[in-house]
């Protein structure tokens, strides 16, 4: 008998998708899911997924519940090769998490994040009786000229000035899903900056945490220590996505998963938390410097940051440094209205993130975001 899954999850090997899949394990609800995994055969895909889930704290005895038939081999660049798989005809819910999340100019950003998602959505909408299509975007798709705090559902349209090619692609696919598939039961989740895990630290992924390590190592960054940054842990993000996926009726079709003004930490608070892990005192000689001023330190990058590509470090400082000065917060009242709890501030678990990063160089940790 052909396996008849109810939920398709793409991006389960990614940071957010892996956390959501771990949440399904915790709830005992993984048996009805099928996972799109980039692999040439199911056995290879299963091994990749198992390794990801181990990093999210799933035990071996739980992982034995996964079956080969739950692996759909393929990716968003070759939708035509798997969209007619007979197992997909029973799909009711889709979690669209797969994306090229590189903050460089990766050539696959647009083909994957826009064309691939659209091809998948068209194919599934044609074949399946979908109840929910949960697309994971980014709160940064709001653009540079957003009000602060950024309202949920905010859209400046074609006037949007995008931060990066990645954020532009995530904005574009949202608009085209609405335009091209008006009957799609689309729910958009826009997480803010996702860093670490409240119980596992950076074991699942060191994405973005290296930015804080870099600023502390340089003792300089474009932001002031009293400026706040909107960050959520990946396990909170997974809890929110689970709610948006499973709640029978939702009040809205677009949500931020964010700390908001109330639960955003400032850089001094984050520094104090990290200092507990390093055993060093919090910074007393930090200097707020412009990107250009920090570039004058480039001959010290190797000494302060370890073996690194100075060009990529400079690019990272420009991207994250510019954003850090904006002090953007993303309103999260819609999610709270739906019954979601308040998030844990980064300053409450940054110590654990540092403890689980101490054996990884900053330049190595950067590879999570600069592929």
Where are these regions (language model features)?
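N-terminal Rossmann NAD(P)H-binding glycine-rich loop of SDR-like oxidoreductase domains
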Residues: 7-27
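Amphipathic terminal alpha-helices
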Residues: 27, 34, 318-321, 325-371
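Glycine/proline-rich active-site loop of Rossmann-fold NAD(P)-dependent oxidoreductases
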Residues: 30, 197-208, 244-255
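NAD(P)H-binding glycine-rich loop region in Rossmannoid oxidoreductase-like domains
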Residues: 63-115, 125-127
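Conserved Rossmann-fold NAD(P)-dependent oxidoreductase catalytic core, especially the SDR/UDP-sugar
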Residues: 95-96, 104-106, 115-165
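A conserved pocket-lining segment of Rossmann-fold NAD(P)-dependent short-chain dehydrogenase/reductase
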Residues: 105, 209-236, 240-244, 258
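Active-site Tyr-X1-5-Lys
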Residues: 148, 160-190
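Mid/C-terminal beta-alpha module of Rossmann-like enzyme folds, strongest
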Residues: 244-318, 360-370
